[in-house]
Amino acid sequence: MFAVHLVAFYFTKLKEDQIKKVDRFLYHMRLSDETLVDIMARFQAEMEKGLGKDTNPTASVKMLPTFVRAIPDGSENGEFLSLDLGGSKFRVLKVQVSQEGQQNVQMESQFYPMPNEITRGNGTELFDYVADCLADFMKTKNLTHKKLPLGFTFSFPCRQNKLEEGVLLSWTKKFKARGVQDTDVVNRLATAMKKHKDLDVDILALVNDTVGTMMTCAYDDPNCEVGVIIGTGTNACYMEDMSNIDLVEGDEGRMCINTEWGAFGDDGALEDIRTEFDRELDLGSLNPGKQLFEKMISGLYMGELVRLILLKMAKVGLLFGGAKSSALHTKGKIETQHVAAMEMSKEGLANTREILVDLGLEPSESDCIAVQHVCTIVSFRSANLCAAALATILTRLRENKKLARLRTTVGMDGTLYKTHPQYPKRLHKVVRRLVPNCDVRFLLSESGSTKGAAMVTAVASRVQAQRKQIDKVLALFQLTREQLLGVRDKMRAELEYGLKKKTHSLATVKMLPTYVYGMPDGTEKGKFLALDLGGTNFRVLLVKIRRRSVRMYNKIFAIPLEIMQGTGEELFDHIVQCIADFLDYMGLKGAQLPLGFTFSFPCRQTCIDKGTLVGWTKGFKATDCEGEDVVDMLREAIKRRNEFDLDIVAIVNDTVGTMMTCGYEDPRCEIGLIAGTGSNVCYMEEMRNIELVDGDEGRMCVNTEWGGFGDNGCIDDIRTQYDKEVDEGSLNAGKQRYEKMTSGMYLGEIVRRILIDLTRQGLLFRGQISERLRTRGIFETKFLSQIESDRLALLQVRRILQQLGLDSTCEDSIVVKEVCGAVSRRAAQMCGAGMAAIVEKRREDQGLQHFKVTVGVDGTLYKLHPHFSRILQETVKELAPQCDVTFMLSEDGSGKGAALITAVAKRLQQPRKDI
């Protein structure tokens, strides 16, 4: 028993001694965590350099855009061919992707040899050989009668400008075919395939093997957004935000970047890490000074590194008693498969002895232990370096997504990773140690990168087909110049109908006289109350007017839905309650003040303090109001309360209030526009044109109520099925059709209807219509403004959609943003066409060649939407080129305008209370 313990002790001591000896000799190959963190920082800097337009030419890590913008979503379908060129064998594959209720992939493949005379010969011969193999495969599988899309996995660095193109930057591994560098390899393959008349193949995608690996794994796990190869060579790809890729135009979405990390260090960034053995190996390689990171990691070089170390250790007498065999002197005699065999847990030492004996050496027990440890240090360093670079990519993904913790999947492939017994667990352990805030799943690509090329092709086919369907829907909202001119001219005709006595009753644009005859002259003064009713909020203001200065105090009150859609008496009692609260709040209880009432609904007026409601809009439905004088209803509610008395001087529309507010600042202002919850315009019209009011002298403000434009069907040619659905689901079906295409209250609902349709077609949200998406009104217009903001990254768009209960992918977010853009752009253009009709009419009425005018504008859509105001202004400029139109934002809203109109009325003190 004692003897057994003695032998065990001796062996353990021997092992420890040998390990220490090797550790001392290979001290520089053992990398601490501190060193790995430093390497991460260097790799991050190189990635940034590669992504920058100005710095890319000198970057060693090329960060090549692949033009792969989407990963599989499970809806891919069809038959695809795939070629895989990049290793010692060449593979042709047929992939059948079908849904049938579940994801299903069937593959048939054939391997063909890649002789050295082909890989290092003439480029034309190389591609002819590939085309011959493809033709043979198609003939064998009876596919020559079919036209099939093809994905080409090409495992060498290429610069791409599109998915189906790739210019070879340089050969790597053992390839050296002449005349291929700086040429488009897809074009070279297509030319070679043309020599086979029976081949009808469409090359849809060129992908790197890492991209293929990522796509293969992403088909099984949608969280996969990184691909890593650790085999003959080494490389990684990952999904990068487009906003960070300077080399490609556009900021939307993500694109897969082929890092080509094998060249990391080619600029000297890793000189302090490289050892004498790395330098010796590099000098004896096919491409000295190139792919230095790869030469410290990949399977092509690992065995050779071990051989060089063993040779040196033998030379200095640390191994084999100083003996060296001719095999140990021979390049390539130790391969990576030998390293893997020597590091096996149980058979490792026996394998080591056998391999060393085959090399003509006579190893002792201690030699075998030492050699095994050399292999461990070399392969562990490889795993450490890979882990540092991968950890950098994972950190970048986490930071791009602005997450405290990232959950992601890395697709893995490569013979070294797959066949080395210790490599995967070492890599995983170090990665998790370097990025503790990332939960990483490592997924082995069972079918290799060739299936991935087919998946890229399948995704490209799907995206192409989906793009056509999406474009078809969006095209409905793209108005041509001719269509916009048509809207302008029809609006002009409707304006005329509304002004004329004979046609007024049939006109959709009501052109209501407001009895506002003039603008402030700056002499107005006093204290005035103003009410502003027109949306879900109601505002009460105290306005103090002094010579050329206005001070305002206001309070906002909510109008609950049950009040908006209850009885008229309840609505006006609620308004009076709000006035009472405000007077109390301002310490004016019992004060008798002149009041201006901004009432943003169509009213027929016979004088300035009388307004008969024509019809509710914007979601209001209070009963017993339509056809009634709303000023009388307000007076009666004040009487019912019996707490205070107010002198109601004027009732004005919000557009009139806006025009007056801006007119106080700019005498040229004679048009008011509201583009908010609702949409409307007023303007100063010549009295001679207003047939509903007696008198031809001077001008009067006309409230167009243009929201009703199109109620007679005159713009049905540009109304879409979605507009019709929104109209049918509204409180006032068949009414306010123009407003329903242009105002904030309805744009979100149009977007929601489009999203439902696209989802139904399987183009969004994985074809799943959530309960939330079925809910009317979830898509408020403020979300459109947020989603379309140029400053907002897609990640933030996704967050907005998630707040709405919509679980969207990056691709979904792009489509949602496009839909929002199409709907709001059309709204702005139609508003612009309507405005062009008004300014052109004013120009012609005054007989002017050139007309200069200011439009006072208010409304949340105009103020908050990032593009609405610009598009509206551009449209007016294009459709009314002889008019110089300035748009002035009404900072203080239409409430101030009501007070100004009241002030003007009091100043003039006309018994009729006309202005």
Swiss-Prot record:
Per the record, which residues fall in region Hexokinase large subdomain 1? 208-447
Give the EC number: 2.7.1.1
| Record field: catalytic activity | a D-hexose + ATP = a D-hexose 6-phosphate + ADP + H(+); D-glucose + ATP = D-glucose 6-phosphate + ADP + H(+)
Q: Which UniProt keywords apply?
A: ATP-binding, Cytoplasm, Glycolysis, Kinase, Membrane, Mitochondrion, Nucleotide-binding, Repeat, Transferase
Pathway info: Carbohydrate metabolism; hexose metabolism; Carbohydrate degradation; glycolysis; D-glyceraldehyde 3-phosphate and glycerone phosphate from D-glucose: step 1/4
Sorted alphabetically, which CDD domains does this protein's record hold?
ASKHA_NBD_HKDC1_meta_rpt1 (cd24126), ASKHA_NBD_HKDC1_meta_rpt2 (cd24130)
Protein name per the record: Hexokinase HKDC1
Q: Which organism is it from?
A: Mus musculus
